[in-house]
Design a protein with these regions (language model features):
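Membrane-interface segments at the starts/ends of alpha-helical transmembrane spans
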Residues: 36-45, 65-69, 79-87, 152-161, ...
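Intramembrane catalytic core of multi-pass membrane enzymes that act on lipidic substrates
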Residues: 118-181
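Juxtamembrane/interface segments at transmembrane-helix termini
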Residues: 4, 66-76, 108-116, 120, ...
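Membrane helical hairpin/interfacial module
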Residues: 81-146
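Long, contiguous internal "core" modules enriched in hydrophobic/ aromatic residues
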Residues: 55, 59, 115, 153, ...
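N-terminal signal-anchor module of multipass membrane proteins
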Residues: 2-100, 104
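Membrane-helix interface motif
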Residues: 63-75, 139-149, 216-228, 302-306
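Cytoplasmic juxtamembrane interface segments
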Residues: 19-35, 97-116, 175-191, 255, ...
């Protein structure tokens, strides 16, 4: 597909012109410009699609079983361990990895790093998908998902950390949908919608910074609910929120690096030259950002240990594991 940019460089219009000079219809765009036979062949020869089919074949029946027979039918949750794998990994794992959206949005829209613009949309898409699936995981692992709106409307609980997380994640998900909307409007050739979103992009970015910073820190503060279940070397009541926030910075940047590398390797036929030519250069730039974030994380980690007087724990077995983690996962990268 040919891609051309009209005179207004701030509003690139992707028309995807057909070889005969016509414009692709929405239906043809959905089929990626391929015939049904070509699309089917492309689908079947992609090994990732077969892996997804296998995952869905196992996961969908379990998901239906969870909703028809209850949470206990598919998990080993208890009152001592009420949060399962979906909630533990989906919320505390996916949300930091999804920080790429507000990080790249801040860099490009606020700090003027236009050299990072070619990968900004990829970062925004990563963030949107990560937060969306975090909400999906939450609906799966919460005992009564039909009451998910209670902390937002009926039983507010403004003094609770979970109230902050619920409101901010839901609001930030809406902000991310708006931030990625210009890409959809380009695809649908609706320029008025794109111009409107572009006109409020600074406000959306600032809202994303505020919301993401607060709920990333709030997720770290959730560990203060159960301090006895976390080893002192990994727990510091005064610094827990900033530990989580700093880890989200290098996790989000690392996610963009991996996604860009995968796109360049396996989806080059769908990427324009501007993106492909910028991947290596921006990988180095994001790598430097990760290094600074890791240094900051390590310093704050040591400050937390010193503040809580936990040096003696470093001589225990868990202390050796902690030092190994810091060496392999922080110092070496």
């Amino acid at each position: 597909m040919n891609v051309f940019v009209k005179n207004n460089q701030e509003l690139p219009i992707v028309d995807n012109v057909r070889p005969d000079g016509g414009v692709w219809t929405i239906k043809e765009k959905l089929w990626l410009g391929l015939s049904k036979q070509e699309y089917k062949a492309q689908f079947l020869r992609n090994p990732v699609n077969w892996a997804l089919i296998f995952i869905f074949a196992i996961g969908l029946p379990l998901l239906l079983q969870r909703y028809f027979m209850g949470l206990g039918a598919v998990t080993h949750g208890s009152d001592d361990y009420p949060w399962g794998l979906f909630l533990g990994f989906g919320l505390f794992g996916m949300v930091p990895l999804s920080a790429s959206g507000f990080l790249l949005g801040t860099s490009v829209e606020i700090f003027g790093r236009k050299d990072l613009a070619p990968i900004e949309r990829l970062a925004l898409l990563n963030g949107l998908l990560g937060y969306f699936f975090a909400v999906v995981y939450l609906l799966v692992d919460v005992g009564m998902p039909w009451r998910i709106y209670y902390p937002m409307i009926i039983s507010l609980g403004p003094a609770a950390v979970l109230f902050l997380v619920a409101w901010h994640v839901a609001t930030y998900l809406s902000v991310q949908i708006a931030e990625i909307a210009p890409a959809f409007f380009e695809w649908a050739r609706w320029l008025k919608g794109k111009r409107f979103v572009k006109s409020i992009s600074i406000g959306l970015t600032i809202a994303g910074i505020i919301l993401s910073t607060l709920h990333q820190g709030a997720l770290g503060a959730l560990f203060t609910y159960a301090p006895t279940k976390v080893h002192p070397l990994w727990f510091s009541a005064n610094f827990q929120w900033i530990h989580f926030f700093c880890s989200a910075i290098f996790a989000g940047l690392s996610m963009v690096i991996c996604s860009a590398a995968l796109c360049k390797t396996y989806l080059a036929w769908r990427c324009d030259d501007r993106f492909l030519d910028s991947v290596d250069r921006n990988t180095l730039a994001l790598g430097k950002g990760c290094a600074y974030a890791l240094i900051t994380y390590l310093v704050i980690k040591m400050v937390g240990i010193a503040h809580d007087q936990d040096w003696a724990h470093l001589l225990t077995g868990w202390g050796q594991y902690f030092l190994l983690e810091m060496a392999v996962a922080v110092v070496c990268p």
